[in-house]
Amino acid sequence: MSRLILRGARFPGDIAIEDGKITALGTIEVLSGDSVLDCEGDIVTAGLVNTHHHLYQWMTRGEATGCNLFDWLVHLYPVWNELTVEDVYIAALVGLGELAATGCTTASDHHYLVPGGD
């Protein structure tokens, strides 16, 4: 079974990964079939967890900036009321892509909109 060896990260030693699990830490001998990833100077961490997200709000990022919470909600609730099922779907795809690209592997979405009242 091949392993992924993370070498040179800002951790004192190598990290071996097999089947998505860390199997060894420290000085690791590279075996035939292993892949080695040069992580020189990088920080290696487990996947990040976002426990509170509103993915649909990606569609209105940049709107009503500089407002307090109440004014922000007053401005955006009418906008969110017009979102379609497709809008929410696209926002979720983009939002999940951004989370994945920044190291998030688990997210909990707090979705309370019902597009079209369905």
Over which residues does each language-model region extend?
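Histidine-rich, glycine-flanked metal-binding segment
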Residues: 2-4, 10-46
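Redox-cofactor binding/interface segments in oxidoreductases and associated redox assembly factors
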Residues: 38, 50, 109
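Structural detector for hydrophobic anchor residues on beta-strands
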Residues: 6-7, 107
